[in-house]
Curated annotation (Swiss-Prot):
Ca(2+) 2 binds at D140, D142, D144, K146, E151. This is EF-hand domain-containing protein D1. GO terms for molecular function: calcium ion binding; calcium ion sensor activity. Pfam families: EF-hand_7. It is found in: Mitochondrion inner membrane. Keywords: Calcium, Membrane, Metal-binding, Mitochondrion, Mitochondrion inner membrane, Repeat. Widely expressed. Highest expression in testis, followed by ovary, kidney, cerebrum, cerebellum, heart, liver, and spleen. In the cerebrum and cerebellum, undetectable at embryonic stages, expression increases after birth up to adult stage. In adult CNS, detected in neurons of the cerebellum, cerebrum and hippocampus formation, including dentate gyrus and Cornu Ammonis, but not in the white matter. In the testis, expressed in spermatocytes, but not in spermatogonia nor in interstitial cells. In ovary, found predominantly in mural granulosa cells and those of the cumulus oophorus. Acts as a calcium sensor for mitochondrial flash (mitoflash) activation, an event characterized by stochastic bursts of superoxide production. May play a role in neuronal differentiation. One of its GO terms (biological process) is neuron projection development. Residues 17-54 are annotated as: Disordered. The gene is Efhd1. It comes from Mus musculus (Mouse). SMART domains: EFh. Ca(2+) 1 binds at D104, D108, E115.
Length: 240
């Protein structure tokens, strides 16, 4: 079936659907008995409204895009950075989240153009207006003109994978950010993350990191307990 035939069929079907929805949404007047000898006049044909036509065009375009394979799949609202970016350690993800929240001045969960401008200036890599727009466009998957936390993580994912150009503002962002991935080196991070991913599965890696965090907390608690005991002994010696 050609695209023209498919478009005609979809358009015809969608017009029927929209017309049916419109008919259901509008209350119909109760029928009344026509006087004897006077036939009931035919109701005028309903003209399609502008909103119905707009909805029809949107639905038709969406279905054609799906059929042609050009439609972008809807993204799940639930975002789990640990499963979507398994090459990043828990500590690195926490550092990146802290950095994202630092520059999200509006506290709306996004870094807009102005916030990105201030961010790059503080990192020592100021960008032009067009450069900032190009930076956002490179990872802006939902085309909203700003960076979500997932898109922010995507910057460092691309940097670690060597997918950014040398003159890219995003590469400058990844290099100048004061987090672990910068200390590893953008190029060296690729091998580092690949080695980590090969050495440990996602689940075992998280278990090892959680265990290390628990051990670190135990050591800190033990050190605090020893300091308190030493302080009590010193206090008792002076009190005697």
């Amino acid at each position: 079936m050609s695209s023209e035939e498919l478009a005609c069929k979809l358009q015809r079907r969608l017009r029927l659907e929209v017309r049916a929805e419109t008919d259901q949404g509008d209350p119909q007047p109760a029928p009344c008995d026509a006087p004897a000898g006077h036939p009931e006049p035919e109701p005028p044909a309903r003209a399609p409204t502008a909103s119905a036509d707009s909805e029809l065009n949107l639905k038709l375009s969406r279905r054609l895009d799906i059929h042609q394979g050009t439609a972008r799949p809807g993204r799940s609202k639930v975002f789990n950075p640990y499963t979507e970016f398994p090459e990043f350690s828990r500590r690195l993800l926490k550092d990146l989240e802290k950095m994202f929240k630092t520059y999200d001045a509006g506290r709306d969960g996004f870094i807009d153009l102005m916030e990105l401008k201030l961010m790059m200036e503080k990192l020592g890599a100021p960008q032009t207006h067009l450069g900032l727009k190009s930076m956002i466009k490179e990872v802006d998957e939902d085309f909203d003109g700003k960076l979500s936390f997932r898109e922010f993580l995507l910057i460092f994912h691309k940097a670690a994978a060597g997918e950014l150009q040398e003159d890219s503002g995003l590469l400058a962002l990844a290099k100048f950010s004061e987090i672990d991935v910068a200390l590893e080196g953008v190029r060296g991070a690729k091998n580092f993350f690949e080695a980590k991913a090969q050495a440990l599965s996602c689940s075992s890696k998280f278990e090892a990191e959680l265990k290390a965090e628990q051990e670190e907390r135990k050591r800190e608690e033990e050190a605090r307990r020893l300091r308190q005991a030493a302080f009590r002994e010193l206090k008792a010696a002076f009190s005697a």
